[in-house]
C-alpha cells in the first residue's frame, strides 16, 4: 500500500533517527568520493524523504540489493556486477542532455548532485525475469533535469545512453547486446513525478554494480528500463531504439510496463519472487503504481503495446 501524497507531509513529519543517520552517511560517503561541493550543498538542503510515492513495505537488505544484479556490461550472471564493477571509474563523469530542446547542456555529475534537491524514494522494483525487490533510492525527479534544457514541442520521446568503455566494462567486449546500452521513454512518462534519476541507495552513494553514478528508476516498468551509468539523454521526435527490444522485439516491448496479464513468451508474469521471501506473491498491475500512472495509457491496448 502506498502512503500519502508528498504535499500532505513535510520532511519534519517523517524524518526519524534512522533516516537522519542515512542522510548523514550519504553526505559523508559523497564527501569521501571527492564530492565536497555536493556534500556541502546536501548538508544545507538536507536529504528529504519522498513519502507521497514511497511504499511502506520493508526494504530488501542492502547486501541483496548490491550483490544480486543485472548489469550485462559486467557479466551475465547475477554475481558478476558486484565482482567486476570495481573497475569502473565514475569520476570525472559528465551527462550530455541534448536534442529537441532550447538549451542543450553538459552536466558534471557533481553539479547534478549539488544542483538538485535529493529525495529518498522507497520503490518496488520488478524484474522481467519474475523476481522483485524494494529499494530505498536517493535521487531527484527526471523532470527537473528535463526542464533545465527547455524541451521544444518536437520532444515526444526521451532517449538514454550508457557509457561505452570496454576497458572498464568487460561485458561490452562481447556482443551479448548492441552496445552501448540504450533505453527510452515517452516524454509524458519521463516528466512523471515517479520517474527519478538515482545517485544513491540506502542513504549511500550508488554502488557501481547498481548503476553508478547516475541511473534511471521508473518503478512501474520492468527493471531493464532502468538504464545505468548514463552519459547521454536526448529529447527526440520519434520512438528511440532500445537494447532489449532490438535484441528480441517479440519478448521485450518499448513500454515494458509491469503487467501480470501479459506473459513473457517463455514464462508467466502473474507472480513474482520477492528476494528474501519463500512464497511467490501476485504481481500488481504497473507494479502497484497504477493509481499514479494508468491514465498515461488510457485507451491503449496494453497487450499490443507491451
From Swiss-Prot:
Signal peptide extent: 1-44
Taxonomy, superkingdom: Bacteria
Record bears the keyword Oxidoreductase: yes
Pfam families assigned: Oxidored_molyb
PTM info: Predicted to be exported by the Tat system. The position of the signal peptide cleavage has not been experimentally proven.
Cofactor remark from the record: Binds 1 Mo-molybdopterin (Mo-MPT) cofactor per subunit.
EC id: 1.8.5.-
Enzyme class: oxidoreductase
A molecular-function term among this protein's GO annotations: metal ion binding
SUPFAM superfamilies recorded: Oxidoreductase molybdopterin-binding domain (SSF56524)
This protein's UniProt keywords: Metal-binding, Molybdenum, Oxidoreductase, Periplasm, Signal
Function: Part of the MsrPQ system that repairs oxidized periplasmic proteins containing methionine sulfoxide residues (Met-O), using respiratory chain electrons. Thus protects these proteins from oxidative-stress damage caused by reactive species of oxygen and chlorine generated by the host defense mechanisms. MsrPQ is essential for the maintenance of envelope integrity under bleach stress, rescuing a wide series of structurally unrelated periplasmic proteins from methionine oxidation.
PANTHER family named among the record's database cross-references: PROTEIN-METHIONINE-SULFOXIDE REDUCTASE, PROTEIN-METHIONINE-SULFOXIDE REDUCTASE CATALYTIC SUBUNIT MSRP
Official protein name in the record: Protein-methionine-sulfoxide reductase catalytic subunit MsrP
Organism: Caulobacter sp. (strain K31)
Designated gene of the protein: msrP
